[in-house]
Amino acid sequence: MEVMNLIEQPIKVTEWQQTYTYDSGIHSGVNTCVPSVSSKGIMDEDDACGRQYTLKKTTTYTQGVPQNQGDLEYQMSTTARAKRVREAMCPGVSGEDSSLLLATQVEGQTTNLQRLAEPSQLLKSAIVHLINYQDDAELATRALPELTKLLNDEDPVVVTKAAMIVNQLSKKEASRRALMGSPQLVAAVVRTMQNTSDLDTARCTTSILHNLSHHREGLLAIFKSGGIPALVRMLSSPVESVLFYAITTLHNLLLYQEGAKMAVRLADGLQKMVPLLNKNNPKFLAITTDCLQLLAYGNQESKLIILANGGPQGLVQIMRNYSYEKLLWTTSRVLKVLSVCPSNKPAIVEAGGMQALGKHLTSNSPRLVQNCLWTLRNLSDVATKQEGLESVLKILVNQLSVDDVNVLTCATGTLSNLTCNNSKNKTLVTQNSGVEALIHAILRAGDKDDITEPAVCALRHLTSRHPEAEMAQNSVRLNYGIPAIVKLLNQPNQWPLVKATIGLIRNLALCPANHAPLQEAAVIPRLVQLLVKAHQDAQRHVAAGTQQPYTDGVRMEEIVEGCTGALHILARDPMNRMEIFRLNTIPLFVQLLYSSVENIQRVAAGVLCELAQDKEAADAIDAEGASAPLMELLHSRNEGTATYAAAVLFRISEDKNPDYRKRVSVELTNSLFKHDPAAWEAAQSMIPINEPYADDMDATYRPMYSSDVPLDPLDMHMDLDGDYPMDTYSDGLRPPYPTADHMLA
């Protein structure tokens, strides 16, 4: 019987081992318990699965197993044949010769004879390995039909013993390849694993599939035999070793077997895997989290299943409580994939994900730091109200000093979002030299818009609406940032960067000390040039009756509004006011009063209000026929617009005849100041009652990466988290950047 030959095989191997000094690897089991193909990168090489889950050595006795005379004769002939081959090819492999050679060895020394004998011994060892390999394969192949029959036996004891034998065979390479070549046996193993209630049988069968999964042929055999649903079922086992074998085998299938991901999803594998995040074995968790990443990447439904089963909370808990680098890295990969899902993002943030990820920004592992940075970048647009981010903000400011492009991209983008509409964060970043660090990042970035644009947006946030805003405005000047910032207005820079730069210049102009440096940098001609170009483009679409298109996500009307608003603030300085007037801008400003966009009407009336302080400019405004649209704007629902219009009308009526002035006065009183006497004083002094720029958020940007591009890392869906009104001067949120998921490594 072939099974008897398998039982006697260890005896024969022992005899062979006594005849030479090199271990064949069969008797000792060296390198037979191989970790998962993928887990070789996840688990330490010196701590393979055998040390984590110890398999019991099972000795199968021959009692009760019938053995006829033919079997004995076959066994004797096989043994004699192998012995004759060895004696013919390697006569020195006998036990006596080997012992004589060993007897000549002196501890700690190698004789010349031994050195001369080494090549011969190596050759003998290789030949013995070959003989062992061939015998294992031949013996296993002959035993396969009988083992398959025993696995299908109705007696559970017989099935268990058969599973133990197959498990031992699966640990040897030659016999393992024979097993993979038998679809009937693999199917029997899968069936046994799925139907058994015996823990030892479950352990042996999962171990068999685990060993087969280290070869592509084995993966295919498992897949074709319906092994995936059975392995998913084993994820509910109470036995740790069974869990390990099942998750590792599934991991190898997910990595290398086509169709495995869909099969795992259909078998409800995610629903079984997410609860495993509560286990406390770091290496087991590392494989589990990598399975989640492979399943979630590029599949929105999988991301939602992970969310529904409490995945974000479990993943954040791992990032918070563990220090094993490979586990932290694989977990950060999953969070990175989930961080572009609009549903998962708030859940991760609410679970404390920002703080947990921030803990690892100072790690010695570059790949972990990079994953944490990207994930923080992706989550930051929904974390603007989060507390406890002080240490994260400080680390991000420090990260601005590095030269790595990815680090700078993530750090600037995250700072841009976390300083959006958050006065506390703005103040903290400003007080920790954030302005200086951002300026230096811009200077080093060159033409890399992925760094420059978020850095400019962050500076725009820091220079407005918080207690240290004036300090930030001055800091830009003191760190020689104004010339570099003004240069960003030049084409062919991308429109999002130009738009952000215009808003920053507007904020810098709020500080009187910045007016002279801005003028020296020739900011006014550049703003006027951009204004004219953007207005012409917008008018062409109006004339053609087409909707205003977006250029790189920016409408030309936004550029018109931004440039006019910046010129409005700059016009508070007499020298700037004169330069703006000499550039023949008044006809354009008057034309903008007819715009259908309320914000454009407001900033146009505002800049005319400043220019009208000079008599020559006031006369030019009147000559352009501004009175009619200004009278209409007195009835505007926007108080700022109405106030500016009243101030301009009041100024240009000063030199008119008494009848005209009386008519203007009556109109002002009836339309604007009937219930607000203070507004009349404001109009007379041309001081706006309210800050004209609302604290609206910019529309969000593109996601960092998308699940629909090649793997390592992320999801390329447009990640819009709100339809916010566009305002050039407002704080703007930045969603994740698009990036291929293969960057996840």
Curated annotation (Swiss-Prot):
Write out the ranges of the annotated region (Interaction with DSC1): 574-661
Instruction: Answer whether the UniProt record assigns the keyword Cytoplasm to this protein.
Output: yes
Q: How would you describe the post-translational modification of this protein?
A: May be phosphorylated by FER.
InterPro entries referenced in this protein's UniProt entry, alphabetically: ARM-like, ARM-type_fold, Armadillo, Beta-catenin
Q: Which GO terms describe its molecular function?
A: alpha-catenin binding; cadherin binding; cytoskeletal protein-membrane anchor activity; protein phosphatase binding; transcription coactivator activity
| Any GO CC annotation of this UniProt entry | cornified envelope
From the Swiss-Prot or TrEMBL record, state where the protein is found: Cell junction, Adherens junction; Cell junction, Desmosome; Cytoplasm, Cytoskeleton; Cell membrane
Where Phosphoserine occurs, residue numbers? Answer: S99, S125, S182, S665, S730
Give the record's membrane topology. Peripheral membrane protein
Q: What's the domain of life for this entry?
A: Eukaryota
Q: Spans of the ARM repeats? A: 132-171, 172-215, 216-255, 258-297, 298-341, 342-381, 383-420, 423-464, 470-510, 512-551, 574-613, 615-661
Provide the domain comment: The entire ARM repeats region mediates binding to CDH1/E-cadherin. The N-terminus and first three ARM repeats are sufficient for binding to DSG1. The N-terminus and first ARM repeat are sufficient for association with CTNNA1. DSC1 association requires both ends of the ARM repeat region.
Family as reported in the entry's similarity comment? Belongs to the beta-catenin family.
Entry protein name? Junction plakoglobin
* Gene responsible for this protein: Jup
